[in-house]
Each structure stands twice: as structure tokens, then as C-alpha cells.
Amino acid sequence: MKLLIKTCLAVSAATLAAILLYVIAQRPTPVSAATSDAVDRIAGKPDFSGIWEANNTANWDLLTHQAHPMVAQPGLLPNTVVLAAPVLALGSLGWVPGGLGVVEGDEIPYQPWAAARKKENEEHWLDRDPELKCFQPGIPRGMYLPHPFQIIQGNSKIQMIFEFANAQRTIHLTKMEPYPNVLWMGYSVGHWEGETLVVDVSDFTDATWFDRAGDFHSDALHVTERYTLADKNVIHYEATIQDPQVFTRTWKISMPLYRRLEPNAQLMDFKCVEMVEETMYGHLRKHQLVKHWEGKTMNVDITRKIPPGEEVLERYISGNPPAKK
């Protein structure tokens, strides 16, 4: 039986850099083109090395969508929503930006039971989205998160490091034995079809989503990626999705990925585990935060009462010691 090890501890970018030493050591010097607009090459193949980032709203919703509040609750009139408390507090920042879809045909072909599950996921997005818990994003979602990622290309493998959660993946360009476990980022084996890198990704966990709109998959997910340089600063990215347990047919997404051109472009640490300790481990608190529901909105009272006898200790812990008498 496949084992799922949910490793969510973020490591520093410096630690991940050490992992890349083997890839860098085997990496031959790129052959520079005659002009600045031509594509660098390694062993006769396009060199994808660099820092890249998508520029779309696919992480919010793969399909075409209008701007709408992140969280809402039913209003008195049909098709009218009432903003939930978190949205009111955030103002315009609490809204999802509108965007054009990246799915071919603008439709995800769910089986009936899965369509109902997707709708339920979307309604409970704040409780269920793995991104909120700092889980590794999976593929293809990692490719269009609103965070940059770095590609380092060698002869036998290509390494990708993602700023979000310091996630990483390896694309093996030589024949490898099947991996014995499931992986958050899948198991990737690539080959070249002319100027296009084709990557077969399998052995996924079922714990990742495609976006914040509740689009999901099972552990039978199979992704075929295609990377083609439109020019030296733009990758045309395609991903064909197969999952017979969830979808009625295969479907495809496509988008451009853009090279970051700043002279000092680099990945920064985004150790999101430290940002979600309450979400991940709040249930282990000795004195848990008070939660109550108003309709479909969960309110959290962060002004908890200090247990009797612990007032002085709590003041020192919070950096607000009692005044000296």
C-alpha cells in the first residue's frame, strides 16, 4: 500500500540550494546565442534555467470568473450574497480578482458526485484549501501560484524550487525505477520532443487542489506537461489532466510563464508553516480560542480569558510585564 508522508516543515532557501549542488555540478556551460534574443541551449536543447512566474488568476479559479468576495453567506434575496466578517475587515483586499479561464473549453468535466464535492469544497474554502495549511501545492498548481519558482537544468535532471513553502520537484530525464510512495509534487519523468520538454507526472497524493475554488482530484491523477520556449523570456506551458475517478474525460490547461528579469531576481523564504500554526495546531492549545458560528460564517474570539492565577505569567510571556509597585 502506498504510504503518504505529509511533510510540511519548511526549510530555508539556503538549505535547498545545497540540494542543487549535484545538478549544478553536472550542468555544462550554456551555449550563448549570437544575439541577445536567441535562446541559450544545453547539449543542443533549450535551456529553461532561470526564475519564472505566472501572471494570471488561475490559483483563484481555473475557470473564467468575475470579481467576488472571498467569503460570503446567503442574503435575503436569491442570487444576492452578504459579505462575511473576514471580507468586511479586509475591504477591497477581501475580494477575488476576476480573470479569464486557463482551461480549454472553459469547463472541467466532473463526474456528478465530484461536481457536488467541488461545490462543497468551494463553500468551505477557508477550512479545506490545502494552500491555507501550507501543504505543498502539487502539480500543476505549483506552476501558477502567485510566487516565483526557479529552474536549474542539467543533462540528466531538471530541478525546480518553489518560493511557496520552499517546495521542490525533480524532473528525471533518464529512465528511473517507479517511486514506491505517493508524493505531494508527484513523480516526474521527462523527455524531449524536438524543442518541447514533455513531463509525465504520476504518484500523487489526493490531498492537493488545483485552485482556491475547490477544484480537486484523487490519487489516480496523471498529468502530462509540455514546456516550450516561445522566446527566451516566455515559456508556453500546457498540462493535460487525467483522473478517471473524478473526471469524465481528460482536460487541458495552458498559460504563459514569464521570466523574472530583475538583475537581482532570486527566491525569498516563504516559510508559511510559521504563518499557519493556529490553523494546523490550534486544537492542541491548552486554552483553545473560542469559535462560534453565525450561519455559515465561523467567528474566532482571539481575546481569550486568562486562567485564574496565570495573569502575571501571561504578561511576561506577552512582553507586557506588570508595573512595579
Model regions: which residues?
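PEST-like low-complexity, intrinsically disordered acidic/proline/serine-rich tracts
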Residues: K2-K325
